Amino acid sequence: MQAVGIITEYNPFHNGHIYHIQQAKKLTGADVVVAVMSGNFVQRGEPALFDKWQRTQMALENGVDLVIELPTFFAVQPSHIFADGAIQLLSALGVDNIVFGSEHPEVDFLSIAKQAPTIAEGQEFKNHTQTFASAYAKQLEAETSFKLEEPNDILALGYASAILNQQANIGIIPIQRAEANYHDANFTDEQSIASASSIRLALHKGKTEKIKNVVPEATKVALDTAANTIDFESKFWSMLKYRLTTDTVGQLGQIYQMAEGLEHRFAKTALNDSGPQSYQSFIKSTKSKRYTFTRIQRTLLYTLLNIKVDQMQAAMQDPYLRILGFTSTGQQYLNEIKKQVTLPLISKVDSSLAKSNLRLDYKAGKVWQLLANEGAPTQDVTRMPLYWEK
């Protein structure tokens, strides 16, 4: 069977994702669509609106055949690590191609990746008046003439670089994003496709009815099951502030990505009685020219999850394939490839796995449950892959 891979967050699943799946099958003639999907926390360092099982169900009902979890130690990372982890998993699963959205699908990303500068080389990366991403983009443009600005182009280059670095036998097929741009904040009632960020914004404003033209039935059903959604504003900040005010600066300094004195800035700001009173205002108070909003946000999530440097580094060296769900076609594909798969395949998590290989995902799942409204189910131990009959 020929397989095409897609790398996703589905936060939430919308009509643009259906277009992506359809194009992936059409352009490759694949028999099976394999999605590597972020778990309960996404790349920006935020909890997903719906848990990984709800989002898996949405995917299976709309054309995906096999959903594999992108572990927390890859999912909540800068684009190059996110991409590298996703390609590791798809390569282990034997996919022939990956198809992804891009703002500039005409670009030869593999060619650019071959010319791209090695990350963090050069004096310009020691210039603290700009973010790492800005420094990288400037050096890349100087060496390749390619202006790297858009989020999906950044991920596209990450995928291409990962394929080259891993010598993975995977072809890449960029496609134009359908109608909506990543940063679009609004959409009209006439639109059938909107960006995930604009949908999240509409939900945040309580405009549930507004989004029903831009999401499939499976997402509408999940929206009606409000018990499983995140109570972000009231719970996330309270839990995080507790960590920031009770941990010592030394303890905060052990957290992954807590670099260049960020722990002092975090602790000082959190302990200031007249300081920021919300999560968003806290980030604005602590960010600098050196660190993007998203970088600060990810570091705060690592703090909430208490992920230390050595834990993250060890986990990244020991990846696995956690099966979240499949169709009959996906099950057939797994049976066909399971003897050739180069990473551990995990379908059921018991307490021993939760304390070892999957410890970070298990912890992330428990914290997501705490953040969710009443009624959110357990996320890992005893949960079996979902099955959807096509």
UniProtKB/Swiss-Prot annotation:
One of its GO terms (cellular component) is cytoplasm. One of its GO terms (molecular function) is ligase activity, forming carbon-nitrogen bonds. One of its GO terms (biological process) is tRNA modification. Its EC number is 6.3.4.-. It catalyses: cytidine(34) in elongator tRNA(Met) + acetate + ATP = N(4)-acetylcytidine(34) in elongator tRNA(Met) + AMP + diphosphate. It is an enzyme of class 6 (ligase). ATP binds at residues 7-20, 101, 152, 177. It comes from the Bacteria. SUPFAM superfamilies: Nucleotidylyl transferase (SSF52374). Keywords: ATP-binding, Cytoplasm, Ligase, Nucleotide-binding, RNA-binding, tRNA processing, tRNA-binding. It is found in: Cytoplasm. Catalyzes the formation of N(4)-acetylcytidine (ac(4)C) at the wobble position of elongator tRNA(Met), using acetate and ATP as substrates. First activates an acetate ion to form acetyladenylate (Ac-AMP) and then transfers the acetyl group to tRNA to form ac(4)C34. Belongs to the TmcAL family. HAMAP family: TmcAL (MF_01539). This is tRNA(Met) cytidine acetate ligase. It comes from Leuconostoc mesenteroides subsp. mesenteroides (strain ATCC 8293 / DSM 20343 / BCRC 11652 / CCM 1803 / JCM 6124 / NCDO 523 / NBRC 100496 / NCIMB 8023 / NCTC 12954 / NRRL B-1118 / 37Y). The gene is tmcAL.
